[in-house]
């Protein structure tokens, strides 16, 4: 039988040093969240498609398949909706501070360079309407990046209510809204100028400026307030100012008033994290106060933060932070009747490991191949050095 030895698009293997680094990063992140008082939650990788089929996930690219009963299931494309399902269906008492880590899957287009399988970690703060919840998410994200020694990172703030308010006042069709969203995301000055000419409103000056309204937080927010008198937008700008003042002591904070998240469920402050050594954002999140309504008749205020751990592993590697794995310095060849003694000797000797070869000569050959400087033989007669690499 000829097996297909290629990997599915958007997936990859991790070996040795990279795999160990990814494992340690996930441990560090989870430990950091635990220290901040977050309680861990785990959900299945496989969910029924209904969990992700709402309007909030209209753009999600799902891995779909049928179970043995013919029901449509998917590999989860994010963690937030499954956690919303748990909170809404188990009757847990709010408010909650939850943390998680695990795999997510998104069926991206071929040759786009995106990973279809990602390791994600994050937090969900549910039941807190206060802006302190956003502040906690941002501070937690900054704390993780500092703990991982990520160099030259920057946190960028936006506000989902700004885009929603603009769309509300323009009263666009679904097709026109998609086109407008694309113009905003691409910061197309020419395209937006043409759009405003064809769709005049009281927000013309503000909309025309959106492609330029990004950069240092204080200056951009001050400029934006002079471009509109709309109460909804001004309220959003005030919330952004409050957060900037609260967290700017911890990191470099910028704003982008044209920031539009891929998922439509965000309702308030949104944020992303970037670094000099990364091509894309590796941290994202924001407020979504109506997301849980798809699972229950009532809504709960919520804020979430997600970290792409694969991107953070790559960042650490590029920054030279990932340490080499501790090399084996002693190989222990043993006779079966001396196994107990060999095991005890290994436990007491740092950077040692047992040999699985039947003969001492094979153990020595292995040590030479993998640059292990010393081999000992453990037998009923005791412990004897049988190979020692010459020091140059």
UniProtKB/Swiss-Prot annotation:
Superkingdom, natural source: Bacteria
Cellular component annotations (GO), alphabetically ordered:
cytoplasm
Disulfide bridge positions per record: none
Q: Does the keyword Cytoplasm apply?
A: yes
Q: Which GO terms describe its biological process?
A: histidyl-tRNA aminoacylation; L-histidine biosynthetic process
Q: Which UniProt keywords apply?
A: Amino-acid biosynthesis, Cytoplasm, Histidine biosynthesis
Fetch the CDD domains from UniProt: HisRS-like_core
Family recorded in the similarity comment: Belongs to the class-II aminoacyl-tRNA synthetase family. HisZ subfamily.
- Assembly description: Heteromultimer composed of HisG and HisZ subunits.
- What PANTHER family does the record tag this protein with? ATP PHOSPHORIBOSYLTRANSFERASE REGULATORY SUBUNIT, HISTIDYL-TRNA SYNTHETASE
**Miscellaneous information on this protein:** This function is generally fulfilled by the C-terminal part of HisG, which is missing in some bacteria such as this one.
What is this protein called in UniProt? ATP phosphoribosyltransferase regulatory subunit
Organism of provenance: Listeria monocytogenes serotype 4a (strain HCC23)
